[in-house]
Amino acid sequence: MALNLQDKQAIVAEVNEAAKGALSAVVADSRGVTVEKMTELRKAAREAGVSMRVVRNTLLRRAVEGTEFECLKDTFTGPTLIAFSNEHPGAAARLFKDFAKANKEFEVKGAAFEGKIQDVEFLATLPTYEEAIARLMGTMKEAAAGKLVRTLAALRDKLQEAA
């Protein structure tokens, strides 16, 4: 279906707004993936706080101009599916990585975070806020327990020397 100028401008504005509010973006090629699988991916994306859109490459280039995802322009070739992570920087990358494992036709082209092209594996392995806090607390707890053990050992050594 041919798009008129107003439709194209609306698409560019919509994608631009999504890009401005996003933490990261991932670009993929979904050629060969069945409609049922794409529907599952879209459902999983909604649940993960990821907005996805298939957009013409020329419109996508215009939409990302002036955003931190302008670095992805070189990946806009062939059918392009773009996903913006709104809640966690690694959400879209994790979603696409897992989907690509299950669907060999699905190809992840690239990802961007903080204005730079990033490895999808790197973004997908970023811990969520809750995971990062849990790791920090575990490290702090571990350090406190270690300090207590060293203090008790020093006290024991001091008492043995005195005896």
Curated annotation (Swiss-Prot):
Q: Which Gene3D superfamilies match?
A: 3.30.70.1730, 6.10.250.2350
rRNA-binding listed as a keyword: yes
The superkingdom of the source organism is: Bacteria
UniProt KW keywords: Ribonucleoprotein, Ribosomal protein, RNA-binding, rRNA-binding
Q: Which GO terms describe its biological process?
A: translation
Matching entries from CDD domains are given as: Ribosomal_L10
Q: Which GO terms describe its cellular component?
A: large ribosomal subunit
Report the InterPro entries cross-referenced here.
Ribosomal_uL10, Ribosomal_uL10-like_sf, Ribosomal_uL10_bac, Ribosomal_uL10_bac_type, Ribosomal_uL10_CS_bac
Function in brief: Forms part of the ribosomal stalk, playing a central role in the interaction of the ribosome with GTP-bound translation factors.
Its family?
A: Belongs to the universal ribosomal protein uL10 family.
Q: Share what the entry says about its subunit structure, partners included.
A: Part of the ribosomal stalk of the 50S ribosomal subunit. The N-terminus interacts with L11 and the large rRNA to form the base of the stalk. The C-terminus forms an elongated spine to which L12 dimers bind in a sequential fashion forming a multimeric L10(L12)X complex.
What name goes with this protein?
Answer: Large ribosomal subunit protein uL10
